Every structure is written in structure tokens, then in C-alpha cells.
Amino acid sequence: MDQQPERREGRSFPERKGQKRKLEEGAAAVEDREISAVSTDGGQALLSEVAAQVSVLNSAFSWQESDRAAAKRATQVLAELAKNEDLVNVIVDGGAVPALMTHLQAPPYNDGDLAEKPYEHEVEKGSAFALGLLAIKPEYQKLIVDKGALPHLVNLLKRNKDGSSSRAVNSVIRRAADAITNLAHENSSIKTRVRVEGGIPPLVELLEFSDSKVQRAAAGALRTLAFKNDDNKNQIVECNALPTLILMLGSEDAAIHYEAVGVIGNLVHSSPHIKKEVLTAGALQPVIGLLSSCCPESQREAALLLGQFASTDSDCKVHIVQRGAVRPLIEMLQSPDVQLKEMSAFALGRLAQDAHNQAGIAHSGGLGPLLKLLDSRNGSLQHNAAFALYGLADNEDNVSDFIRVGGIQKLQDGEFIVQATKDCVSKTLKRLEEKIHGRVLRHLLYLMRISEKSIQRRVALALAHLCSPEDQRTIFIDDNGLELLLGLLGSLNTKQQLDGAAALYKLANKSMALSPVDAAPPSPTQRVYLGEQYVNNATLSDVTFLVEGRTFYAHRICLLASSDAFRAMFDGGYREKDARDIEIPNIKWEVFELMMRFIYTGSVDITNEISKDLLRAADQYLLEGLKRLCEYTIAQDITLESIGDMYELSEAFHAMSLRQACIMFILEHFDKLSSMPWQNELVQRTIPEIREYFCRALTKSTTNLQSLRL
């Protein structure tokens, strides 16, 4: 059920991200406007501009100041055009890649050249920048690398080695690192080639560079190179990058600690041995500190990394909590940033695999925000919240808190996007159900007695769904839980009515599992059945009934054995006692014939059309077996439109099984009945009978359970 969020590679497109780039004053500003005009003009003007700049690069590879100035401007123009992704194809097709490649290195130095090198490092910087922008497509990444860019870019990373230190040196190193980042982005083969070309050691060294932008660029490149590449990860660690990266976690520069935590996260991902080294190197507390960073990206990466630290093969779950991670993680659950909430829920879900952490997270206020996230329409966020709640449900100390904050209703009523989340929620409810006994149940009963009304109702609702059948009588009869549910059912609040009805329906089904009553009743045991051949047969008949002017031949011995009504008729002081012919008024012939057929055979086929008249006759003549068969037949035909009439019928003829079926129908279909204008009146009318039914059913089910155990 645990699903780790995907890590993402970084990519360095600073200008595409809206960061401002400083342009040289004067003519450079004018040139920039000219470039913008070309890029928006398109067509032939663009092709001509690209061709012109490529021609300059191909012809200006020397230390002459005019060549250096022209080459610098050409790289700037191409880079400016490449910021528009729609123009990249035109630039590459125009031959820009090999031309820019040439200028990744300084031109050869001749004896006649000046001692001072004009625009030193700046042309190389511009070339690296432009090539990085062109690496927007995988095929262009490969083209640039196949042309031999990597060795030159790696050499640019070492420009500070000759002792020179200037803004230009810093810039060329940074652009080289950014270009490597973009070339290797989501390209495993190029990541490997960077390592083979020796790119990782200088990048690790640059983590300690004095210029913060260079540090950030180096960390960004290492982050990309470490992503899903085990050999690169191992070399980064072997180059002793961890101590510096951990120091960078504490930087006040958000951009630096964001890249640093990203590198560490990619190193740790799917690499248990590196995770162990990272923890040994002291990363835990700085990462926890980033949870309170002003940078949401750093917070997100830190939460994800803590979730990785707390995976099932780790023993540091408790340490993470002890060092103060829980409260900031819970605060992050309430952020407007969806990804921040997702990573926080992920981390808490991992931490909640420890029993003491489960109690601590709930005690610190984690339950409410996690339950709220179940309303999210983001499937990944919803699932991570559900998984965290699944962990918290494993601790008995949290069960009452789940119920007190309305967690059971939240889990039951939620609309979950993916099947994995639905399964997780089902398992959470099952886990909670298994814990409602012993001290947990005693605590809940205590809350149901002394808490404010809203809490009492939540407890009663939860117990109706989750309690064991053997505890139903204690909870709902002895401790008044039934009255709380009936109070909800009789409420004027529709939501409360629906919750009460659903809980009562669940409770009824549980009790019926031990005392099933919805199956078709068997024929009653009777001492005398003469058989089908004696139905309306004059043979040995000693009494006849006159029904609608027709004669029905019967036998006293069979009638006496069938019901108290006939025994009173023939053995009591009524005039029918000695009569040979008895008139039966107010009953149809077909109804009387079916009633007598039941008396003679113990069974009869009952149709919907005749069932109500037959029920009336069965009630009049006290034929309980026939009455139950009629009630069962009628109950199969209950609808939203007929439920009111059916309930009246059950009252008129003391039809207890039919009345129970009506009650169950009302509870099961309460949401649909709520739109009926007469619904509220019907509910209020049935509440006394519902109370009586549950008192009878819960007492009976408990007795049955006890007898089963004996």
C-alpha cells in the first residue's frame, strides 16, 4: 500500500524560468532588442541571422580582440534565440552546434598575440550557455555529446585551477555545470559518459567553491547525475561529497540547501548502503531543520528524504520523531502547496510504522489534517494520507481519537480515486474494528456516557459499524447507544438522519447474522395434515363452509389441529360448535380455498395479487404459519412508493415479520426516501417500533451467541 512519490531531476534553464539576466549596457541592450525582433519575425530573417552568427563563430577563432568580441556577441545572439524553444530546431539545423563546440575551448595562443587575453573565459561561457539551451531534446543532447562537448565542458569546470579568480571564471564554470545538467537530464547514457570523462570529481570539488552560484550549479549537476545511476552515486560518495553536502543543508541561501537536499535524496533513493552512510555522516538533524525552511521546495525534498530514511529497512523512525520532525510535518499537511502536503503525508506514513510514533503523531494533532486530505482530488496525495491513517490505526491509543474527530464517518463516506486507496481505507476500518474490545471499548463507552452530545453520537455511530456482535447488547441496550442512534434518526438534520439510518441498518444486519429472519419461513409443525386429496372433498367430511354461495367440504379433526380460532369455533360456546353448515362472510372464495389448502397440506403458492387478502384471513383465523408466508411474499414487493401502505398493513394485521421488513427497507433506502414529502412523518411513526425491534433483536442475538458458545 505504501507508494513512494517519484523524485524528479533538476534542469538548469535559468532564463526560461524567468530569472533576470544582466546584459551589458549600451550597444548590448540595442543588440538584444534586435535579436528579439528576429526571433519574432521568423522565416528568412531568422535563418539569415543564425547563418550569420555561425559564420562569425567559424571564422573568429583567435585571440584578436575583434574576433573575441565578435565571437562573444555571436554566442549571446544564439543563446538569446535558443531561449525560445520553438527556434531550437532552426538553430541546430543552421549548424550552430559544431560552431559553438569550437569555442568551448580557448583559441591557440600565437607569438604575435597580446599578453592580455581579451574577453578571457567569456566566449567559452557563452558557448556553454547556448549549448545547454539547445539540449532541450534528447536527439540534440546526443548530437552535442557525440560532437565531443563533454571533455571541453569538464575542462571548463577546472578553469579555477590555474590560480585565476574572477567573475568571468566563476561564470564560465557555472555555465559549464549547467550545460552538463541539461545534457544529462533524463539521459542515462550521457550521465555515464560524464562520469567516464571525469566530470564528477571536479563537480564535487566545486561544492566548496567560494561563489554561491557555482556551488549551486555544481550541486544541480550532481543531483542530475545521481538520479537513477548507481555508478554515479557511488563515485559521488567516494569523492567525499557527503560532508560538504551536509554542511550545505544548513546554508542560509535557500537555493543552495534546496540543491543539496536534492542531491542527497537522489543518492539515497534505492541505495540502502548510501542511506546508511548519509545518516552516519550526520544528515538527519539538518534535514529535519529544513522542514521549517522558508523555501517550499526544500521543505518538500526534506520531507521526501525523511520518508526514505524511515523506510521499513531503517531503524531511525523513532530518532526522526525524537529530533522534532512531527510538528513541522503536521504543519506542512495544511500548506496550500499540494506537493508539500503529499511529501509530508508520505513521511508521516513511513514514521507511522512504529507503535510509539503512531501515538505521538496522533497526540500532536496529525489525525485531523490527514483525514481532511482524504477530500483531495489528487490521487497521490489522497493515497499517502490514507496510508498514514492506516499506520495510525494500528495503535489502540488512537482508536478513540479516530472516533472522537469523526474519522470513521470520513473513512466510510470518502470518495477515493484509485483502487489502492479504497483497499487501504477498507483495511484501516478493519484494523480499527479489530481493536474495539477490552480497554478500548471501555474507553469508548465512557466517552459515550460523559462526553458532549456530538461526541456521544460519533461513538455510537462508530460502534454500530465496528463493534463485535457479542458487545451489541452492552453498548446499545445497557449503555443507551440505541437511544443516541434513534435521536439521530429523528433529527431534523438530513445528514444526521442518514448517518443514524446507516448505523441502524448495519447494526440490524449484524444481529440478523446470528438470528436470520429474512429467509422464507419453513412450514410450521402441525400434528394433522390430511393431504391434498382431502381438500374440499366430501369423503368423511363432517362440516361444510358456505363461502360466496359455494360449498367447501372440510374435516373438523384437521381444523381443530390448525389454530386456536378453529378450536374455539368447534370446542367453545359458539353456535358453530354443532352446526353442519357454517357461513363464512367477508372472504373471497379463492382466498378461503388457499387458506384451507394450507391447513390440509402445510404449504401453498401465494401470489402478490392475493397475498394481502390471504394475510387478513390468516390473521383472522390465527394461522401463524400461513401469516408468515404471506408476510414474506408481501415483503418482496416493498418499494419506495408502497412502503407507507405496507407499514400500515403490518400494523393492521399484527404482521411482525412484515413490519420488520418495512423497518429494514426504510433504514436501507433512507437516502432515497428522504426526498418523499411524507418521509419524516413515516420515520417519526416508526421510531417506537424500531426501538422495540432492536431491543428484541439485540437481546435475542446475544442469547443466541451465548448458546452457540455453550
From Swiss-Prot:
Signal peptide: none annotated. GO terms for cellular component: nucleus; plasma membrane. SMART domains: ARM, BTB. Residues 541-608 form the BTB domain. GO terms for biological process: negative regulation of seed germination; protein ubiquitination; response to abscisic acid; response to salt stress. InterPro entries: ABAP1/ARIA, ARM-like, ARM-type_fold, Armadillo, BTB/POZ_dom, SKP1/BTB/POZ_sf. Keywords: Nucleus, Repeat, Ubl conjugation pathway. Detected in embryos and most of the vegetative and reproductive organs. It comes from the Eukaryota. Residues 1-35 are annotated as: Disordered. It is found in: Nucleus. Pathway: Protein modification; protein ubiquitination. Disruption phenotype: Abscisic acid (ABA) and glucose insensitivities. More efficient germination and postgermination growth. May act as a substrate-specific adapter of an E3 ubiquitin-protein ligase complex (CUL3-RBX1-BTB) which mediates the ubiquitination and subsequent proteasomal degradation of target proteins. Acts as a positive regulator of ABA response via the modulation of the transcriptional activity of ABF2, a transcription factor which controls ABA-dependent gene expression via the G-box-type ABA-responsive elements. Negative regulator of seed germination and young seedling growth. The BTB/POZ domain mediates the interaction with some component of ubiquitin ligase complexes. This is ARM REPEAT PROTEIN INTERACTING WITH ABF2. It comes from Arabidopsis thaliana (Mouse-ear cress). The lineage of its organism: Eukaryota, Viridiplantae, Streptophyta, Embryophyta, Tracheophyta. The gene is ARIA.
